[in-house]
């Protein structure tokens, strides 16, 4: 979980051709499977894909990550200072774990399949991971799936071929 205080701002909104001001607000954010699922249902594409996302898509993901408060003026996300956006994305990209998996398979190729929230839910089911883990930082959840896959018994269907 990440808590960020967004300072009050005043500026020109080019969309509405008006001066706007936003109050200082403290956001509680979580990069989780729930936030990825919300974002994918709006944008209809995999969040974890390696493609470049627009500024609008990236800032919208921050709104999907917001746990509290609710009913936030969308202008807060549009006027959020770049340094705070960068801090949020450092948090998103943090592994949140000390666990490392060393593959002993030579020449192992990664699956070309792009993970979506539905696919990650499937992996959770296959691995027997409880749904309450959907609230975890996404990197931790993906690492747990990778650990389950690495520890799975020989002959058992793999929870996930690629993390």
Put a short name on every predicted segment.
Residues 1-43, 70-156:
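An amphipathic, hydrophobic-aromatic interaction surface with interspersed Lys/Arg
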Residues 55-64:
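A short, structured beta-strand/loop element
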Residues 157-163:
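Conserved small/polar residues in nucleotide/adenosyl-binding loops
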């Amino acid at each position: 979980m990440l808590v960020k205080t967004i300072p009050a701002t005043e500026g020109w909104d080019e969309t509405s051709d008006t001066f706007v001001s936003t109050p200082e607000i403290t956001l509680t954010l979580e990069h989780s499977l729930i936030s990825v699922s919300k974002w994918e249902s709006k944008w209809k594409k995999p969040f974890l894909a390696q493609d470049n996302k627009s500024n609008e898509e990236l800032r919208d993901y921050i709104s999907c990550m917001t746990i509290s408060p609710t009913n936030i003026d969308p202008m807060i996300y549009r006027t959020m200072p770049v340094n705070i956006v960068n801090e949020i994305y450092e948090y998103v990209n943090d592994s949140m774990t000390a666990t490392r998996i060393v593959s002993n398979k030579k020449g192992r190729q990664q699956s070309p399949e792009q993970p979506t929230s539905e696919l990650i839910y499937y992996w959770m089911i296959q691995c027997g991971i409880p749904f309450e883990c959907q609230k975890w930082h996404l990197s931790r959840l993906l690492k747990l799936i990778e650990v389950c896959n690495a520890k799975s018994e020989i002959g058992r269907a793999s929870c996930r071929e690629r993390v």
